[in-house]
Design a protein with these regions (language model features):
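Residue-level signature of outer-membrane beta-barrel architecture
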Residues: 36, 106, 168-170, 242-244, ...
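Hydrophobic, lipid-facing positions within transmembrane beta-strands of outer-membrane proteins
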Residues: 18, 28-32, 98-102, 160-166, ...
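Single conserved hydrophobic/aromatic residue that forms the stacking wall/gate
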Residues: 1-12
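Gram-negative outer-membrane beta-barrel transporters
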Residues: 45-190
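C-terminal beta-signal and adjacent terminal beta-strands/loops
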Residues: 173-219, 230-235, 241-312
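Extracytoplasmic loops and strand-loop junctions of Gram-negative outer membrane beta-barrel proteins
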Residues: 13-18, 81-89, 144-150, 218-225, ...
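P-loop NTPase catalytic cores that bind/hydrolyze ATP
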Residues: 25-54
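Short sequence motifs at beta-strands and strand-loop junctions characteristic
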Residues: 20-26, 83, 91-96, 154-160, ...
Length: 312
């Protein structure tokens, strides 16, 4: 791939300029919220946030022009007609999202209190803008046409999320509280796209024009960025704390133990987070082989912390 490497070296020296008509992006947000103190001590909250972008920023190649031809698979053919460059400009479309959340809280006389929550998010954007430089922002996304300006599911859109917090306080030692806290969460998977291989996109579909860094970023079908959903992730954390007498009057002590991802502590197959590798393009062969997602080590491990708090 000598020619491809030479093209990559050229990309490093590409100029980046600002569209003379560039407008500063902005967002409009509208939020609604309410709290209902329901009978029997239940407290119910609900919130809705609607966001609409304006003058959304997008990077494009400033040197490309369509030849008017397309490949057999329908990919447009480009040629570079100027010095290689990127331009930061405004999208013809805008980012948008809707987020709804609700929760219910109840405290019982037995020493138990609980909070259950649910959140739904539907977020769409033109470009996830994941990076600090123009070239990376250009290639670290999925597209059918690298110059396209379309709104699709966002990398950051997690459709469903459930949360539960349970606290139970009792006294195994007279006058000193023992407190158990269980935090549990379950959320739907991360979005990803079905793409060509890195070689298939950079060379097969676009013949190095533009250079696409051999990322798995060229969609098999148009309009399908992030239309796939990864595996759900469910985990729980446990904290147990015990009040203790201080060394002198007025001092307080508390011993605690925290098990992060107690689900994985109980079973190696539980509490495991799997998601596609960045930038979230997956080939059909990877899907067929069952390797579309990778295990995320840090989030999937269990951890135990113990300590003592002493106040004086």
């Amino acid at each position: 791939h000598r020619y491809g490497r030479r093209q990559r070296q050229m990309c490093i020296r590409d100029s980046v300029y600002l569209d003379p008509d560039f407008d500063i992006p902005s967002e409009w947000k509208v939020s609604f919220g309410g709290t209902w103190n329901a009978p029997n001590g239940y407290v119910i909250n609900a919130d809705l946030i609607i966001t609409r972008g304006q003058d959304t920023a997008i990077y494009k190649r400033g040197d490309l022009a369509k030849t008017g031809e397309v490949t057999d698979e329908g990919y447009p053919v480009y040629e570079s007609v100027k010095e290689p460059s990127f331009v930061l400009t405004n999208s013809l479309n805008s980012n948008e999202s809707e987020a709804f959340s609700t929760s219910v809280f109840k405290s019982f006389d037995s020493g138990l209190d609980m909070r259950l929550g649910y959140a739904y998010t539907d977020a769409r954007d033109v470009n996830p803008m994941t990076s600090s430089v123009a070239f990376s922002n250009y290639v670290n996304r999925s597209f059918f046409d690298p110059q396209e300006d379309v709104v699709s599911n966002s990398n950051y859109s997690m459709k469903h999320r459930f949360v539960g917090v349970f606290n139970y306080t009792t006294s195994f030692i007279d006058g000193y509280d023992t407190r158990f806290t269980l935090y549990a969460q379950s959320n739907s998977g991360y979005p990803y796209s079905i793409t060509l291989s890195g070689y298939g996109g950079t060379v097969g579909a676009y013949g190095y024009t533009p250079y696409l860094d051999f990322n798995e970023n060229v969609l098999v079908q148009a309009g399908t960025r992030n239309d796939q959903e990864g595996s759900w992730w469910t985990k729980a954390d446990l904290r147990v704390s015990q009040e203790l007498p201080g060394l002198v009057e007025g001092h307080k002590a508390r011993a605690f133990i925290v098990i992060d991802n107690v689900t994985n502590f109980l079973n190696d197959d539980w509490g495991v987070l799997e998601k596609p590798n960045f930038p979230f393009g997956v080939t059909e062969d990877d899907v067929a082989a069952g390797i579309a997602e990778a295990r995320i080590g840090g989030a999937s491990l269990w951890e135990i912390r113990m300590g003592v708090n002493y106040k004086f």
